Amino acid sequence: MAELTRIEGVLRTEFGKGASRRLRRDGRIPLVVYGNELDPVHVHVDTLDLHALVRNEGVNAVFELNIDGEDNLVMVKAIDQNVLTLDIDHADLLNVKRGERVEVEVPVIHEGLPAPGAMVVQDVDVLLLEVDVLDIPEEIVLDINGLEIGEQILAKDVKMPSNAVLVSDAEELVINIVEPEEEELPEDDEAAAEGEDAAAGEEAEAPAESED
């Protein structure tokens, strides 16, 4: 596999909301590293480094976090984003080992177009998989090209990435191909349309005036 991204982390010496705000103001993101029977480790990293990692490698990114000269294999477990700016305010990392299998939620997307007159409804956005920590797929892509009304894709129908095992319910509905619903006019619009139809009918029934 490709070489892992390496990010420098610095142990935190101050804690609390005020300290976290100061870190973010200085271009740093506070993190907590959990896992492997170790006590949680509080660190902070460069904002640009973490944003680039998540943007390029996804929300389940695995990378080397260097703390005090020692590399630690970690994966992103949870991200707290600012609801307005979408900037990462905080992240939880999981300390992992090479060869370890983990359960992760992998994003699901679809590509292609269903048959003419059909509409695609995607019922779930992620599937829970068990995979090797170094083989986590960034996403699962489903081909819906040409699917007809009434066809469905269940979780058990999804082709799993190499060495991945489905953990989600096998019968979970992922994709549903349906007939588009007719858009209902608001009552005011319906009344106006009926009035126009009635007026048109009256005009058609009115006798033509004689020309003298």
Curated annotation (Swiss-Prot):
Function, as annotated: This is one of the proteins that binds to the 5S RNA in the ribosome where it forms part of the central protuberance.
Example GO biological process: translation
rRNA-binding among keywords: yes
Subunit structure: Part of the 50S ribosomal subunit; part of the 5S rRNA/L5/L18/L25 subcomplex. Contacts the 5S rRNA. Binds to the 5S rRNA independently of L5 and L18.
Annotated region described as Disordered, given as residue ranges: 179-212
Entry's family note: Belongs to the bacterial ribosomal protein bL25 family. CTC subfamily.
Database matches in InterPro entries: Rbsml_bL25/Gln-tRNA_synth_N, Ribosomal_bL25/Gln-tRNA_synth, Ribosomal_bL25_b-dom, Ribosomal_bL25_C, Ribosomal_bL25_long, Ribosomal_L25_dom, Ribosomal_uL5_bac-type
A cellular-component GO term for this protein: cytosolic large ribosomal subunit
Pfam family, one: Ribosomal_TL5_C
Underlying gene: rplY
Highest taxon of source: Bacteria
Keywords (A to Z) from UniProt: Ribonucleoprotein, Ribosomal protein, RNA-binding, rRNA-binding
GO molecular function: 5S rRNA binding; structural constituent of ribosome
Protein known as: Large ribosomal subunit protein bL25
Species: Corynebacterium urealyticum (strain ATCC 43042 / DSM 7109)
